[in-house]
């Protein structure tokens, strides 16, 4: 079964928006990792917004990607904000990860 997935990046003076639509899983995560890596490597602007409101599915690969992005941005001095679709939020809820835990994950370096 072929699923549709798209990742796009938009950069303004204030922020970088990395938007994803479709299914975020082991097959599509490398595209998102590349976009995040490019944004961090550019080193400006220092605000990244993950717009994952268009995701229809997210597996544990997406959870790992979000956690590693929180840490990576914190270590690089970036502010990170995110918008999650209901399916993505359900994936986080299923494993007990909530916004406050995500934020503290980046702060304490756990």
What kind of feature is each model-predicted range?
Residues 1-57, 61, 67-110:
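STAS-like cytosolic regulatory interaction modules
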